[in-house]
UniProtKB/Swiss-Prot annotation:
InterPro entries: Ribosomal_eL30, Ribosomal_eL30-like, Ribosomal_eL30-like_sf, Ribosomal_eL30_CS, Ribosomal_eL8/eL30/eS12/Gad45. Belongs to the eukaryotic ribosomal protein eL30 family. Pfam families: Ribosomal_L7Ae. One of its GO terms (cellular component) is cytosolic large ribosomal subunit. The gene is RpL30. The lineage of its organism: Eukaryota, Metazoa, Ecdysozoa, Arthropoda, Hexapoda. This is Large ribosomal subunit protein eL30. Keywords: Ribonucleoprotein, Ribosomal protein.
Amino acid sequence: MVAAKKQKKTIESINSRLALVMKSGKYCLGYKQTLKTLRQGKAKLVIIAKNAPPLRKSEIEYYALLAKTGVHHYSGNNIELGTACGKYYRVCTLAITDPGDSDIITTLPESQV
């Protein structure tokens, strides 16, 4: 019970930080744009939904490793990630190039590669 509350709280804090990035920062949504941003070396953090296809997930992780970029595995599916981003469509991957006013890059524990 306690672990479920803590997990819900961390999801809400990640969602609030994502909303702040959407308002004040720069980002790329989608698989192709994320790969393009990683190849250019502009991405600071990559967020992948839980139900992303394994091949795409491993490919993004590989490019992030080469670019020395942090990867966070979002605990919700792509519909929940899209909702957290304030979009009405599904978002499987998301690359943050400029966090803006948000401290999402420094606060995510799994983001260090």
